[in-house]
């Protein structure tokens, strides 16, 4: 349990995921879980250091909340995995990169935003004591409408072969990744909708959702599944309800029968009034019991 900024309390779990990007969306190829009070970096560090899904030559996109020089150095040195991540504004490496970009004054056009420009700055690792591997930076300059002044974003990478344009192009995949993650949490996969507090049941539910999510996106990246690539699970479920017939199962004694819903309703409407009344009474009692359990 943790205390929120507004004074309320929250209980739950934390889920860390490694996403392998495909042509459309991606697969959750590695996950880790912990109690909600565990820090994000503490949860993800073992995952990044040991996950078999990360292989030499891979490129990892990270959020600035995961800034950890030791982990970044381990990934590059021991695993030969490169990283792209934004630096915090108050870091010395950030200020160094901005000043060097201004001194060189060799700005390039941003690949996707007409009113922004960027510059490549090589060798900023000496201003970040926790980082033990060479770093290049991409300084993005833009007009901050809220602050009404020129502002900067600094992306760093351990892949020294990348130019400024490719650093930005790779990192611009992050907003789409975050949108997909929000869909997984609340969109239709209902990752946050837990019916039990038992850890074993929570783990089973989460792993089932993660596996289903990945299998869905794996299918969406095949030729037969391309028609589902740009649709959320919610949209597909709604479309299915609108266009496909539904069925119900009716039990009586030791027997059951599967009826198409409209056919079953038609059959019920053809029953004699006394039988319909008995059925109406039974349904009222049954629905009342269900509502009490919920």
PLM-predicted stretches and their roles:
Residues 1, 20, 26, 44, ...:
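Short, conserved catalytic/metal-binding motifs centered on acidic residues
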Residues 1-21:
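Active-site-proximal, Lys/Arg-enriched surface segment
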Residues 32-53:
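Active-site beta-loop-alpha junctions of metal-dependent nucleic acid enzymes
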Residues 40-41, 67-72, 164:
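Short, well-ordered alpha-helical microsegments
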Residues 69-88:
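A short alpha/beta connector and helix-capping loop motif
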Residues 164-195:
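Short amphipathic alpha-helical "interface-anchor" segments enriched in bulky aromatics
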